[in-house]
Amino acid sequence: MALPILLDCDPGHDDAIAIVLALASPELDVKAITSSAGNQTPEKTLRNVLRMLTLLNRTDIPVAGGAVKPLMRELIIADNVHGESGLDGPALPEPTFAPQNCTAVELMAKTLRESAEPVTIVSTGPQTNVALLLNSHPELHSKIARIVIMGGAMGLGNWTPAAEFNIYVDPEAAEIVFQSGIPVVMAGLDVTHKAQIHIEDTERFRAIGNPVSTIVAELLDFFLEYHKDEKWGFVGAPLHDPCTIAWLLKPELFTTVERWVGVETQGKYTQGMTVVDYYYLTGNKPNATVMVDVDRQGFVDLLADRLKFYA
């Protein structure tokens, strides 16, 4: 039986590819998609969800827009990474359908309430919508199987020296998620920076030759440009968000550890840092499954295999 999931995202090139991977996978039943502000403004990320679902001919999936800003902060966006539209590069279709007449939290709550079994929430942007759901609907916590997030790092940040972008945008929301008591799976930079797509991988996707694989290759062409900066030391572009979906499909591709994670919300230099108690120094019980390594080739092969679904 397919695993029911709710996808909360802020497309974003890697979010878009996570959507492509999820909807090409019969093991997953995507119940709804909600958008968060992050990689671009809330209006643009919502539009990008609708554009991707129009491309994939999945306008049957309910969509709703989420919070327009973080819980306690002003919004920061990553337009230097994702471009003016949030999905610069390919020519994507205009949306042929409209979002639901409700908020992201309302759609999430309705989906959980109506599900016969607990639902996995996959969150690949800032955690604002998920935190609002947890705070406003404690009665629905038991309907959440787990929360799989792309965010954080055990070491180096990618937005500040200490913080990864998604967590930095709304650290208060991320702290609510980690301390919720619901199982959390964290795909942080430790693993996503190893999930790099090289130029030859992009050409492999392009050669599959269907409209979706071509769009994915064009998304990667644009995404690679930012990551060519030699400061990163990358060979390709790290495909952060699809690691969440890939872990659900093939957990054997990933090495994980069980650890306690907290989020720094106050620090002078470390706001947005995920503090991972790797050596069990706090005495706190682990609250997260933390991905630390990935079989890169297996990850690329999975993407290539699933892109053939769209032939």
From Swiss-Prot:
Gene3D superfamilies: Ribonucleoside hydrolase-like (3.90.245.10). InterPro entries: I/U_nuclsd_hydro_CS, Inosine/uridine_hydrolase_dom, IUNH, Pyrim_hydro_RihA, Ribo_hydro-like. Keywords: Glycosidase, Hydrolase. GO terms for biological process: nucleobase-containing small molecule interconversion; purine nucleoside catabolic process; pyrimidine nucleobase metabolic process. CDD domains: nuc_hydro_IU_UC_XIUA. One of its GO terms (cellular component) is cytosol. It holds the Pfam family IU_nuc_hydro. One of its GO terms (molecular function) is uridine nucleosidase activity. Its EC number is 3.2.-.-. Transmembrane segments: none annotated. Belongs to the IUNH family. RihA subfamily. HAMAP family: Pyrim_hydro_RihA (MF_01431). Hydrolyzes cytidine or uridine to ribose and cytosine or uracil, respectively. This is Pyrimidine-specific ribonucleoside hydrolase RihA. It comes from Shigella boydii serotype 18 (strain CDC 3083-94 / BS512).
